[in-house]
Amino acid sequence: MSELPRGSTIRKDAGLYGYERALRRHGIEPIAGVDEAGRGACAGPLVAGAAILPPGKAGIVPGLADSKLLTERARERCYEQIVRRAVSWSVVVVSHEECDRLGMHVANVEALRRAVALLDLPPAYVLTDGFPVDGLGVPGLAVWKGDRVAACISAASVLAKVTRDRIMTELDASWPAYDFKTHKGYITEVHSAALTAHGPSPIHRMRFVNVRRAAGLEPLDPVQNGEEAVELVEVTEGTR
């Protein structure tokens, strides 16, 4: 990943489309944003989205913002606008089994790479949310709180979040005791109580401490397994 082109600046009041405008002033196009949903959940898949929005008014999505800041209804409205307006977009689903096999950080990076690779139009530049993603094959920039300040990342976050929420709602029909349709696999009091009462379902991620505890298993050794902290602590409601 790299920095913005020499001479580029982003004003704090540049708005949601400031990064894209700054890059286009240097002739950089197309610009993709990529983000994920479900990293902090202890059940269900990890989903990554990527989006390239057109320049100008055609790329302005009414109501677009970080998916976590939108209501479910608002996210659905934005989703429909994004798939209609985007020059190219993609969604990648990484199963809970693959998350367990790879570990969450590796699975997360792999999902983001796959989402960019699936775009019909290869991007010239990629904006990512929060941390750099190597192996994309093009220059890019990690943007702090990117899903709140860069439109293409916000669009990607909506694609990922809506897709994952729909999947978790469908999975709820198979395992209704866990109420996946409500908490989407994140830990809440209801989810914790269900884990205690029923043990893990087939779609729970067995690397998480609370899931292993419910299964009567010891936590994974972080040294032997190379796990990052997020996988070895109790996950709480509201994490990604």
From Swiss-Prot:
PROSITE patterns: RNASE_H_2 (PS51975). SUPFAM superfamilies: Ribonuclease H-like (SSF53098). This is Ribonuclease HII. InterPro entries: RNase_HII, RNase_HII/HIII, RNase_HII/HIII_dom, RNaseH-like_sf, RNaseH_sf. Residues 29-220 form the RNase H type-2 domain. Coiled coil: none annotated. It is found in: Cytoplasm. Its main location: cytoplasm. Signal peptide: none annotated. It comes from Nocardioides sp. (strain ATCC BAA-499 / JS614). HAMAP family: RNase_HII_B. Manganese or magnesium. Binds 1 divalent metal ion per monomer in the absence of substrate. May bind a second metal ion after substrate binding. Endonuclease that specifically degrades the RNA of RNA-DNA hybrids. Its EC number is 3.1.26.4.
